[in-house]
Amino acid sequence: MGISERLTAAGLSAGEAERKTGLFEAAEQRLALLTRRACKSAPRWFVPGRIEVFGKHTDYAGGRSLLCAVERGICVVAQPRSDRVVRIADAILGLETSPTLSDEQESPENGSWRAYPAAVARRIARNFPGVLAGADIAIASDLPRSAGLS
């Protein structure tokens, strides 16, 4: 079963599932450039976008939120690494960053795209100190920027 069929079986409309195939191909190509090897068998995930209908900025403070998923989202293709580096490349925006799994790393400039992956790497290192392996990750997203979707 191909990626489009799996996405349709998981609930995406046929048209959106087909569009995600192109995003997965873009992410796969970007990962191949990043790792300098073919990535046809690399694991892949689709993360649907969400709209916060009610409760914005309350969920992380213990409050309640009402969310709904949308058919736009982020396509992820990844492979493990043997070191603590997490290389992340955005196939659409052409951005790349390589934080390490360490809670002592310096933060990129505030507001930079690179700050988000760095914060995740720091949090993983802090919460899961036994994690010793990083990953090469390529993403491709059709979430509109600055549209209130996450």
What are these language model-derived features?
Residues 1-150:
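ATP-binding N-lobe of GHMP and related small-molecule kinases
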